[in-house]
Amino acid sequence: MAKKVQKKTNKKVPAKASEPRVKDFLDLIAPTAVKFNTDHYVCGGTYRCTLALRSYPASTEELALLRRLGEKSGVTVHIYNRRTSAAEEDKIIHNAENKNKLDRGSTSSMKQAVTAEANLQDVAALIASMRKNSEPLIHCAVFIELSARDPDSLRALRDEVTSELIRSKLGADRLLLRQREGFLSSNPAGRNTFGSQFERVLPAKSVANLYPFNYSGKTD
């Protein structure tokens, strides 16, 4: 009689239970997935979009230009700034002076000549103020992140914020097809992914006036 072949059974060794890992700060604040669309993105359970300031008023008497945005729910203002060196400061002023002098001598457009003359007066006033107050020039970029529960609320909030910016003579870029870069720029742990594209060179006093805090302008 043929002997029965006994099958060897491999005993499964129970896997050791992995110890729970303590989450760090980035794991706690970062969402698991972000879906980017043309003019907004979905982050967790909220709809969001990022705007970038691209134009600023030449002069204003208003203080704390963005203070109304700082008081709104669902609005986050992120400001990047870096100081210019002495050589860079001289180069910026020299280039602005030469450009406006060239435009002032234009005979084809009266509007261009008048605008250049006004710009030269602004440059002269800026130099006088910098000399009097020992005020440096600063590269500044401002990104505004909006957050809402649904797309309709996000559109309403964006229209409201845009109206506030226009009232303060500020222009914003909606960053169409660039919301991913906007998300990285407005993130607390992010960076200015646009580089110098939305940077403007402003006096230190004007940069301080962008922070959403109302102040008297005096040290006391």
Can you describe what each PLM-predicted range is?
Residues 218-220:
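Glycine-rich phosphate-binding loop of nucleotide-binding enzymes
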Residues 1-216:
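Extended, folded cores of ATP/NTP-driven motor/assembly subunits in large transport
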